[in-house]
């Protein structure tokens, strides 16, 4: 084993945060220094050249001052017997760098701890808990112990459970020991069936049965028979959901039978490479819409980052594994937790009711969980465009007496939408003899029993089992798998996939039987064919673990070679683990032990498990009206604005990429001031169309404490009032996902669940013409524990989260909450679907005063809601609405405030909508949460708007309440009485406090403070655009039609590599990607539009010699996470070029040709900056390292094009315009001041960050990474090679910009870059 010291692992502020945690735990720790330590398992001693190469490979990341470590060393490494994602990716890089003697690399972190007193054993345990993840890592106290990383344990054998002798008791004991969560009737069922088979079950068979039949997988409660108050009910919960489909399935193509639902999309030109030539082009066809929303509540409570991360990963796989392969497109996340209680920022309504030790608190969930969800989406390459965040934890008088209701078991929602080909919506048959394949990462001993564990109330399983049920993530692996699926579906009728499922709860023990069962087959499997990174695992652990990033599929034998070639090119691991059989029987053979751990008929596993029956009693609560005595209006506004459900959520948004794909038409951030208040998310269906897709969310969970049905109806209603801001057209074009969370079995809750499902499934949705083709249930939303000898429990309210998906006619017509002051005189209209009832039960106002209230808002008249939707749609389509915001948490007051924040303007309104001189209840008028919306319309259009509202029966509930004023004010009148006059800037600051506090705790506190202070500046002019060229001029047009001499790229022996002169021939553009790159398609689309022939080139094509760069005119290295950024962002990619002779020679020759050009964006920028020794004229280029915030930053940033020789920026110097930024490692790092001066004097700086005043800035977040002098793009001395961190390819279309001036047409100013490249070639 070779040992190599690495760079320091923690920045100064990270060390300070760790020391702060030590102080909180009363640990006598005075200092901490940490550095990476690398371990290499070699097959032979490395020679000096190999040692030098390896040392260079393992030198990466930002330069942090090193010092000789002192103090006690604690070495954190991956658990021996496991192989970490870092290890597999860095080993891949080493192999690609011709380091064949390196069998495996692994990394640890050495912490050197200085103490003021000896640590006790308990203190040492506490310290270790701060620095390692006990599921995945261990702590050693000496370096030599790390040799255990490369030792392999002997496989453990299968264990049988002796029911033939021990009877039922033996199975009961196994049930507890293995955490199977089997019900009493299931135990009887298994004893009976295995006795009939005349043999004992093996532990692997029992675990497989438990997973496949868990509540998580089988949805027993939703499929149960029901008796309520002694009356047998006609329908199960699921049948009532399916009723929506029976009543209306006009545009639904697949429901209830696959991993995601499918609805009709638009006919567009889908843009992807030809499977044969690998040249990108448009394919005119239907882009149908995938819909899925998952929950990952239990793992997120135990370990928030991996819990939320794998929740997002699992939902992405669901979309990819729909039909014969789908394409995930855009994501959403949501969190409901108990009170945050931010230290030093505790709020008056936040009481501490305690929690069990095995779960983390709400604050920890919200500091870590959103990062996990965002990180997976970011690295996979899916924009996260939508979400919600609610806190609730209160002692209330409910139908069960006084009890604590809250979310100690959190809700973690992960969802999204994608696209699928029309011919791939339905799965095929599995032919007998089909090869059964596992695609993706290796088996690891994690996530055991996840399906069963999540089906129990928190506290019913042992703590070790709870922790064992959490999975760990590797999104870069999932990206590789998705690339394989993409290559398959892009083959159309030749798609080799016959059947596909994702691997989720229960691992392959659930996925493979489900695969063959759905295909009406049996299966014969080989255990030792399963890719396995932990050889010491038992058969149960190999078969049942929930290692992530895996898919199972059936491929006909004649298509196997094609599939194998695709996997090899994408470097996606796969294995044939079995064959489909005619007989519906399941066999698993283990050649290591020469036995058969599983041998059972399919119908015992999946066919005849007992059906559940639920007997429920209705319990209702009579709430008390809100006590107004302690509520003062001004103070109430401050409290409500600080409630997390209302408060600004920037800390949850800027950590997530919102521009990848180049198809995002509406993200959360609105207007020139980028305020996170969008009503819904919108994407374009492709790059050649304005058709698209929209999604919105709705949830009002505290209302269920007063009225189960009202809570469910409001969730649907809110999703509709949100999505109404997009151009949908027909309401039947909207489909819903319903995610149900319930503390099943809690008094009154079962009947309440039935009432809520009936309210939407049998009543509201059929009345509106809406379908619920997809959803999920989580039926164990309760946490129990013992504290100080007292039994405690926190029970969640019944929680329905609705997500609405809709096809969009024209994405340009989406209306945001941004109030406009540049459109002439305007009026504000309130549409009040509560029709003046102004009910305050379970509102934000009630919550911040620790009350519940009596009557909540409701959907009393479905026809009124339908009329509202169609009226707003008519106004949106005719462009009669300047701004739109639905009324939700915080009521009318918050709606108006958020619209003012987005428009950076003032509002003046009169809330008296009655016939009398004044409204008789100001508090209720301002803070009720009845459904509705506020519209800003031109005063000249007011009569037209009123006419449309009247046509849809809305006259009685529509009121002109005020206007926009060009002042820093929110001024509210009640008739002639001015009841509130507040500074909008002050309110904006209050609204931002929660996000600031969370950012300061989680990220670099200095940057968080800078961002918070910037929000206090009322003089901030917001984003703007000033161009030095004509945005509408297509400078490339004359060249696209002219003759062009091109040399066809060498992409294999079949291509004739001869010069040809073709009229209108296109220059050849290599769209270069490495494993983990995710921004290549939008890059190809931009160059294609500029007149290039864009070709998909994978690094594996170059390393294999299948593609030669000499045939290309241009080369672009694209953005993403090559190798998961394990050896520094872009550095592993660069070193696989520098240290591989085949690749090095090709790149060096290409860069030296004077008839080529190159571009590196984001990850490609980082990669090319590390190739400077091969690129003439790039000697001064800096490195790009971790952002100063130490956080992934997704911003819409203002930049200025500098005067340089870059061919891309010809005639663009001096132009200022916003651009998408998405990176975690974009900070320019120079060697010293002299290096920086040399860069500045060389004239190679091409782009700089500006603040909104037009000044070059280093201030956060206008400069999102802290680069000196705002530098974010550079070029070579001759201008042929340009590198930049921002993403012009994601915003080349105007509609893809988060904000843009109204006079921009189809192409944004960034299109000029790509056209300049075409002009340069002549």
Curated annotation (Swiss-Prot):
Gene3D superfamilies: 3.40.50.880, Phosphoribosylformylglycinamidine synthase, linker domain, PurM-like C-terminal domain, PurM-like, N-terminal domain
Binding site for Mg(2+): 718, 722, 886
Catalytic reactions on record: N(2)-formyl-N(1)-(5-phospho-beta-D-ribosyl)glycinamide + L-glutamine + ATP + H2O = 2-formamido-N(1)-(5-O-phospho-beta-D-ribosyl)acetamidine + L-glutamate + ADP + phosphate + H(+)
Keyword Cytoplasm: yes
UniProt keyword terms in alphabetical order: ATP-binding, Cytoplasm, Glutamine amidotransferase, Ligase, Magnesium, Metal-binding, Nucleotide-binding, Purine biosynthesis
HAMAP family noted in UniProt: PurL_1 (MF_00419)
Cross-referenced PANTHER family: PHOSPHORIBOSYLFORMYLGLYCINAMIDINE SYNTHASE
Protein name listed in UniProt: Phosphoribosylformylglycinamidine synthase
Species this chain originates from: Photobacterium profundum (strain SS9)
The encoding gene: purL
């Amino acid at each position: 084993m070779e040992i190599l010291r690495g760079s320091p692992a923690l920045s100064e502020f990270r060390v300070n945060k760790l020391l702060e945690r030590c102080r909180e735990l009363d640990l006598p720790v005075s200092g901490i220094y940490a550095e990476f330590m690398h371990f290499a398992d070699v097959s032979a001693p490395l020679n000096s050249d190999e040692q030098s190469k390896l040392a260079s490979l393992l030198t990466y990341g930002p330069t942090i001052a090193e010092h000789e470590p002192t103090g006690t060393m604690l070495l954190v490494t991956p658990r021996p017997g496991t192989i970490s994602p870092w290890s597999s990716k860095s080993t891949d890089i080493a192999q690609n760098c011709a380091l064949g003697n390196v069998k495996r690399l692994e990394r640890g972190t050495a912490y050197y701890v200085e103490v003021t007193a000896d640590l006790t054993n308990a203190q040492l345990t506490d310290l270790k808990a701060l620095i390692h993840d006990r599921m995945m890592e261990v702590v050693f106290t000496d370096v030599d112990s790390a040799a255990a990383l490369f030792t392999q344990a002997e496989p453990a054998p299968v264990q049988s459970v002796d029911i033939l002798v021990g009877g039922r008791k033996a199975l009961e004991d196994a049930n507890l020991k293995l955490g199977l969560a089997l019900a009493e009737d299931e135990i009887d069922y298994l004893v009976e069936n295995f006795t009939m088979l005349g043999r004992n079950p093996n532990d692997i068979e029992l675990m497989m049965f438990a997973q496949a039949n868990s509540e998580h997988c089988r949805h027993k409660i939703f499929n149960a028979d029901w008796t309520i108050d002694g009356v047998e009910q006609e329908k199960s919960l699921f049948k009532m959901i399916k009723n929506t489909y029976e009543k209306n399935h006009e545009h639904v193509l697949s429901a209830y039978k696959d991993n995601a639902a499918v609805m009709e999309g638009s006919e567009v030109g889908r843009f992807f490479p030809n499977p044969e030539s690998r040249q990108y082009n448009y394919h005119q066809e239907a882009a149908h819409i995938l819909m899925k929303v998952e929950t990952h509540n239990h793992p997120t409570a135990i370990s928030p980052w991996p819990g939320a991360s794998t929740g997002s990963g699992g939902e992405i796989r669901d979309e990819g594994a729909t039909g014969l392969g789908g394409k995930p497109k855009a994501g959403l996340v949501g969190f409901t937790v108990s009170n945050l209680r931010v230290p030093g920022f505790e709020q008056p309504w936040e009481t501490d009711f305690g929690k069990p030790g095995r779960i983390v608190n709400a604050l920890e969930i919200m500091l870590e969980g959103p990062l996990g969800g965002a990180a997976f989406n970011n690295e996979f390459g899916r924009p996260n465009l939508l979400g919600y965040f609610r806190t609730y934890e209160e002692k209330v008088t409910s139908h069960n007496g006084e009890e604590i209701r809250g979310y100690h078991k959190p809700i973690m929602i992960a969802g999204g939408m994608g696209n699928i080909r029309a011919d791939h919506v339905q799965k095929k048959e599995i032919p007998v003899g089909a090869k059964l394949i596992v695609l993706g990462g290796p088996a690891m001993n994690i996530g055991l029993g996840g399906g069963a564990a999540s089906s129990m109330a928190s506290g019913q399983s042992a703590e070790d089992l709870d922790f064992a049920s959490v999975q760990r993530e590797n999104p870069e692996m999932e990206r590789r798998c998705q690339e394989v699926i993409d290559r398959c579906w892009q083959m159309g009728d030749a798609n080799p996939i016959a059947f596909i499922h994702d691997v989720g709860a229960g691992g392959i023990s659930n996925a493979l039987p489900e695969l063959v069962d759905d295909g009406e087959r049996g299966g014969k499997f080989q255990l030792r064919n399963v890719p396995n990174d932990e050889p010491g695992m038992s058969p149960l652990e190999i078969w049942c673990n929930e290692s992530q990033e895996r898919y199972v599929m059936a491929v006909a034998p004649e298509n196997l070679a094609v599939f194998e070639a695709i996997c090899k090119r994408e470097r996606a691991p796969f294995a044939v683990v079995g064959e489909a059989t005619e007989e519906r029987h399941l066999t698993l053979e283990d050649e290591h032990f020469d036995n058969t751990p599983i041998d059972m008929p399919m119908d015992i596993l999946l066919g005849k498990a007992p059906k559940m029956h639920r007997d429920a009693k209705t319990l209702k609560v009579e709430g008390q009206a809100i006590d107004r005595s302690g509520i003062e209006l001004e103070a109430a506004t401050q409290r409500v604005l600080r409630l997390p459900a209302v408060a600004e959520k920037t800390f949850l948004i800027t950590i997530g990429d919102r521009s990848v794909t180049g198809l995002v038409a509406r993200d959360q951030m609105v207007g020139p001031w980028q305020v996170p208040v969008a009503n819904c998310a919108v994407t374009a269906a492709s790059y050649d169309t304005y058709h698209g897709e929209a999604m919105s969310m709705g949830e009002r969970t505290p209302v269920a404490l007063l009225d189960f049905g009202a809570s469910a109806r409001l969730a649907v209603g809110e999703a509709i009032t949100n999505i109404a801001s997009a151009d949908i057209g027909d309401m039947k074009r909207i489909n819903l996902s319903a995610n149900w969370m319930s503390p099943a079995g809690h008094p009154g809750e079962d009947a309440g669940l039935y009432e809520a499902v009936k309210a939407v499934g049998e009543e509201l949705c059929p009345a509106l013409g809406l379908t619920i083709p997809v959803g999920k249930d989580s039926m164990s939303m309760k946490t129990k524990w013992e504290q100080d000898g007292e039994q405690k429990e926190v029970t969640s309210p019944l929680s329905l989260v609705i997500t609405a998906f809709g096809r969009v006619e024209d994405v340009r017509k989406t209306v945001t909450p941004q109030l406009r002051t540049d459109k002439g005189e305007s009026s504000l209209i309130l549409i009040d679907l509560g029709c003046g009832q102004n009910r305050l039960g379970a509102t934000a106002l009630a919550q911040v005063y620790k009350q519940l209230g009596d009557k909540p808002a409701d959907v009393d008249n479905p026809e009124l809601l339908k009329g509202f939707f169609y009226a707003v749609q008519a106004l949106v389509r005719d462009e009669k609405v300047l701004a739109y915001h639905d009324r939700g948490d915080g009521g009318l007051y918050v709606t108006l405030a958020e619209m003012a924040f987005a428009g950076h303007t003032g509002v003046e309104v009169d809330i008296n909508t009655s016939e009398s001189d004044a409204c008789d209840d100001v508090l209720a008028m301002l803070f009720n949460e009845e459904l509705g919306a506020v519209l800003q319309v031109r005063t000249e259009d007011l009569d037209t708007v009123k006419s449309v509202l009247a046509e849809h029966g809305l006259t009685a509930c529509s009121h002109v309440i005020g206007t926009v004023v060009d002042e820093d004010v929110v001024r509210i009148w009640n008739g002639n009485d001015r009841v509130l006059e507040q500074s909008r800037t002050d309110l904006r600051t209050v609204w931002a406090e929660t996000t600031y506090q969370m950012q300061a705790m989680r990220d670099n506190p200095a940057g968080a403070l800078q961002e918070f202070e910037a929000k206090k500046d009322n003089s901030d002019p917001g984003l703007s655009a000033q161009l030095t060229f004509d945005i509408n001029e297509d400078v490339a047009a004359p060249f696209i039609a002219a003759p062009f001499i091109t040399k066809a790229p060498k992409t294999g022996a079949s291509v004739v590599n001869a010069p040809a002169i073709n009229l209108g021939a296109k220059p050849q553009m290599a769209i270069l990607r490495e494993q983990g790159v995710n921004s290549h398609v939008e890059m190809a689309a931009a160059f294609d539009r500029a007149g290039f022939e864009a070709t998909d080139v994978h690094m594996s094509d170059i390393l294999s010699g299948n593609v030669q760069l000499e045939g290309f005119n241009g080369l672009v290295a694209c953005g993403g996470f090559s190798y998961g950024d394990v050896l520094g962002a872009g550095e592993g990619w660069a070193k696989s070029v520098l240290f591989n002779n085949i690749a090095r020679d090709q790149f060096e020759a290409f860069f030296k040709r004077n008839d080529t050009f190159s571009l590196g964006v984001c990850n490609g920028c980082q990669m090319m900056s590390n190739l400077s020794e091969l690129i003439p004229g790039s000697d001064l280029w800096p490195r790009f390292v971790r952002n100063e915030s130490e956080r992934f930053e997704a911003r819409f940033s203002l930049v200025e094009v500098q005067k340089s020789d870059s061919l891309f920026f010809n005639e663009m110097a001096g132009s200022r315009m916003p651009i998408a930024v998405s990176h975690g490692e974009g900070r320019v790092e120079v060697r010293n001041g002299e290096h920086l001066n040399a860069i500045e004097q060389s004239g190679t700086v091409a782009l700089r960050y500006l603040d909104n005043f037009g000044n070059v800035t280093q201030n956060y977040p206008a400069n999102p990474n802290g680069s000196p002098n705002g530098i974010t793009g550079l070029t070579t001395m001759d201008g042929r090679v340009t590198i930049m961190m921002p993403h012009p390819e994601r915003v080349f279309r105007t509609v893809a910009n988060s904000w843009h001036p109204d006079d921009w047409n189809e192409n944004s100013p960034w299109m000029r870059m790509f056209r300049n490249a075409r002009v340069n070639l002549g």
